[in-house]
Amino acid sequence: MSGTTQLRPTYHGYVRDTTDALIIFEACLAGQLLHVPRRPHDRERQNVIKSGSIFVYEEHASGIKRWTDSITWSPSRIMGNYLVYRQLEKPFAPGEKKRAKGKGGKSTTQSGGISKPRQRNALPFQQGLEQGNEYPSVPSDEDRQLVGSLVDSYDFKEQGLVKKTISITYNGVPHHLISYYTVEDVKAGLLTSPADDQGLRGVVPRAELTNGQNFRAPIEESIGGAYMPGMRHSAGFPHPSAYPTLLHQPQMHQPQVHQPLAHQPQVHQPLAHQPQVHQPLAHQPQVHQQYVHQPQAHQPYMHQPQVHLNGYQPSYGDGQWWKYLGGT
């Protein structure tokens, strides 16, 4: 029977962002990691409900409608695509509303490792640990990445647990992930995220997990502005993630992508050749006027007969030639 089988967490580590959860969901669907078949029994909770334990269950097969762990939690807060809870020092009194404290409540330096925002020139929390401070100053944005808005609103348990939950639907079946961790363990780099786990390096979430969900926030969106997706924290300092997919590209620096101006080739429209229409010159035939011969009127030559003497033409040596014409 499943009730007699020792319950083991699906994974040990810390889910930093949505992609970490999707890697675990994918590994479960592929059989590399195992869904849990049931909720932990009372006698098991002390051993399995602890920092680093991550449980994934499939709602239909397990029959789990509501996950229980017998820990007193604060009201939930939305943090990206997760719901986050923090362990309380004590349960609310019967009939007491779960109302957040006012500004005059417990100091945040006594609230589960979360401290007031440090100044910009203050030492990082690692140096505070080296100096022996139990709860050194840390940037408030790092706190919010770990606990959301649950910083100083309730009486949180010292070094208490934080619970993060996220759900997906695959082929119409709901799958749920429950993650436990302490702020101190995450800051100390004691918990590995799935994206940094060499054993899960080749796990790439299928498209139905990344595109087919009703997530409130984009998968790569940073939560609170401190722990950016694609960054892991070893001893509290961020380092580039080794995960090879695009889901964990660092978001710290967004280089401006200069889109080259699309070259618009000039389309040279060929000049439409307008052929010149040569109108043939209309041949005007030359009208040859028929030459009308105008006969020249020739005056008849009046022949003056010469008088020959003895058959010879007389000479005019005497200069009186007219005498020979009959003149006087």
Swiss-Prot record:
Looking up InterPro entries in the UniProt record yields:
Gti1/Pac2 (IPR018608)
Which GO MF terms does the UniProt record name? Answer: DNA binding
The alphabetized UniProt keywords are: Nucleus, Transcription, Transcription regulation, Virulence
Residue segments, region Disordered: 94-120, 251-293
- For this entry, the protein name equals Global transcription regulator sge1
Q: Which organism is it from?
A: Gibberella moniliformis (strain M3125 / FGSC 7600)
User: What family does this belong to?
Assistant: Belongs to the MIT1/WOR1 family.
What's a GO cellular component annotated to this UniProt protein? nucleus
Q: Which domain of life is it from?
A: Eukaryota
As for subcellular location, the record says: Nucleus
